[in-house]
Structures are given as structure tokens and as C-alpha cells.
């Protein structure tokens, strides 16, 4: 059946500094960062309300014979409540220079922690079900995220997964082994899962095997199609995997 169990927000690249750089004031920038999660939560809640009220329409769409199978199954109680995941991109996404596929060895872990804490707090104000840290290129940034998540005043106890960008079947983009990263995540209670994204599909199987040797936490996998990315032109090239 078509449908989704998790709705992901569009805040991957959203930061207060980024919006201010586009000319928005501080308060406007803060609200725009939060809006990415707010809209996803709102859409999910409208769907739940329509189901609870037995509504025949959802945001103007008639629920009838042409209704997607996933919606039908949910309406009949066969699917769980959809979750909202707040997409939280890496420092490299803010830089917009492709460094989320290389790492940033000259940037200290403490600086990365300071980068993540305020935007994490803003996302959490909108009460997503889970935080999805994505395309994390390095062990250092994963440590910074783990520290930020360990502060209950920042994370509000919301669980998270960390998904890494990987350069091959055994290493994250900055060169550390996925095993080292998974070992760390296994010990951090607020991080409930580990993932792989923005990675060539042929690397996924060995990465999963490596992760599973050191942790039983859930693994999320959503790799690239198989094309290559040109960070200078910001375009994809090559053939997608079948």
C-alpha cells in the first residue's frame, strides 16, 4: 500500500543565521526555522482530525474510490499514527559547499555543538515525534549532536536518529569507521537509532553489517539513487541504480 509512516519536515538546511543572511530579521528567522516542523505537525494533525470525524474530504481531496491505499488502510485502523520527523541537517548544509560529503577537520566539536543547540531547541518547540539528523559526515559532529541531545532542556526528551553520509562500505565521509560511530551512538540514550543516507547504494549492505556488529539499535537506510553529485554545480550526473 502506498503511504508513509513518517512525515519529514523541510528544515534540513534551515538556520537562523541562514535566514538572516537572506535579509530576514531575527524574530522572522526564528519563526521560519520553527515553521518547517510546525507545518508537518499541522498536516499530520489535520489528517488525524479528518479520520476521527469521518470526514469525506482531506484538505480538499475527496476520500473515495481514488483514495490512495495507504490512506484507506489508515482510515480503517490498519496503519499506525504517522510520525513527524524534524529533519536536522549538518553544519555542512548550512555552509552549502558540499562539505557534508567530506567533513570539516578544522572545525572543533565544541563549535559544532554550539551550532546545533539553538536550532535543535527551536525544532523541539514544535514537538516533533523524532529528530532526524541527516548526512552527518563525521564522528566529531555526531559527538556534538549527542552532547546537544543529552541536554533535556534542549531536546525535551524527544528521541533521535543520526544518519551518516559514507564514502565507502566501512567509513563515514570524513574517514572514521562507521563502527566507531555506531559504538558511540549505542551508548547515548537519547539517540535511539543510526542511519545511512546520501550514500551510494552499493555501500549500504556492508555498512549495515558493520553497524550491527556493535549495536542492536534500529537502522534507518535511505541512500542515493546511485548517481554522483557535483558539489560545484550542485547537480547530479550518471545513471541511477535499478
What residues fall within each predicted segment?
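Domain-level signal for soluble alpha/beta catalytic cores
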Residues: 1-242
